[in-house]
Amino acid sequence: MEKENITIDPRSSFTPSSSADIPVPPDGLVQRSTRIKRIQTTAMLLLFFAAVINYLDRSSLSVANLTIREELGLSATEIGALLSVFSLAYGIAQLPCGPLLDRKGPRLMLGLGMFFWSLFQAMSGMVHNFTQFVLVRIGMGIGEAPMNPCGVKVINDWFNIKERGRPMGFFNAASTIGVAVSPPILAAMMLVMGWRGMFITIGVLGIFLAIGWYMLYRNREHVELTAVEQAYLNAGSVNARRDPLSFAEWRSLFRNRTMWGMMLGFSGINYTAWLYLAWLPGYLQTAYNLDLKSTGLMAAIPFLFGAAGMLVNGYVTDWLVKGGMAPIKSRKICIIAGMFCSAAFTLIVPQATTSMTAVLLIGMALFCIHFAGTSCWGLIHVAVASRMTASVGSIQNFASFICASFAPIITGFIVDTTHSFRLALIICGCVTAAGALAYIFLVRQPINDPRKD
């Protein structure tokens, strides 16, 4: 893609300016310009709405679980397979997504991804059998693949290293807010227009948002920044911005011990997150005999806890770094503590005797796992060279979603064979704890630019 010379209203967030406009401040002093503030605000608002729509899409099948099973005659294992095939397609698509994102940037990648995942979401409302559903779920998984790597890339591009904690928490919280508002919103939509109308409506909204993203957002390399703006954005960064990775450099990441620690560790986080995302409404309906309306309200509560965990993480990591703790160490502490606590709460869930007790325990498990997960993405910002962030993020996501793809189908199979979620929750807690151990023993050194090795 050629570099754009943007000539728009000077009040716009993305108006270019000559590097000679403002001198670089002396003595290392950096300032955030009004234009950079507007760019950051615009980018974060667009990412927020994209993340909410993204998780409305992901939650739709979970909320409509029992209704779709009855209409299409599907078993719990088949529903689990539909949930798993999405995750598997999403994970595999992460591999080409990273290098493409490093080359094409978030504007094109997220715009196209959002358009196609929303198109397949709308098509989900038109299926009539299991095979058709599998195909549209695969399409959705591929389309959604750029979402998180694009978010990481946008934040890495438009915030300097000391100010990325809160925007990362905000971005991640948006996804959980999407999950939290999904059950009551989707349940209400189903009561009014049925599950088919729900899928189609959400898909159309996503298509409009995709068009808005492409029209409003600009990649950093396509904006002519002043010297002061460059100084602000690069402040504290050890690694300079360079050319995208070659295939050989990308392949070399799989020989890096820290990369494997991130892959295995984040797999523990995504297994837990995806199990609850896929099966929480079904669990509440099956274990506690809740109706659709009550399920919609109760299922929202744990995900609000998860959103809170993401937001709290941003403040905690920024506070630790400003207090003198090394950025990598601050993220690792949050990751490991959050994962062990989440595992403990998940293991206690089967002991709950009331739906409210179960919801609160799951809420604490999600608070802790999303607290940890936010630092996993934050770790990429501080432990990885800038030109490699998208590739590392996509590889991490690839591994974690391959692992997470087993959670729905394993859970569905266990429910079909034991008529209980107990064993599925125990397995989940153990996987989470194993992920924490991967961060302890494998993630010890930053991932440096191979050109400097």
UniProtKB/Swiss-Prot annotation:
GO cellular component, one term: plasma membrane
Keywords: Cell inner membrane, Cell membrane, Membrane, Sugar transport, Transmembrane, Transmembrane helix, Transport
Residue segments, region Disordered: 1-23
Gene3D superfamilies: MFS general substrate transporter like domains
The organism's place on the tree of life at top rank: Bacteria
Annotated catalysed reactions: L-galactonate(in) + H(+)(in) = L-galactonate(out) + H(+)(out)
Protein name: Probable L-galactonate transporter
Gene: lgoT
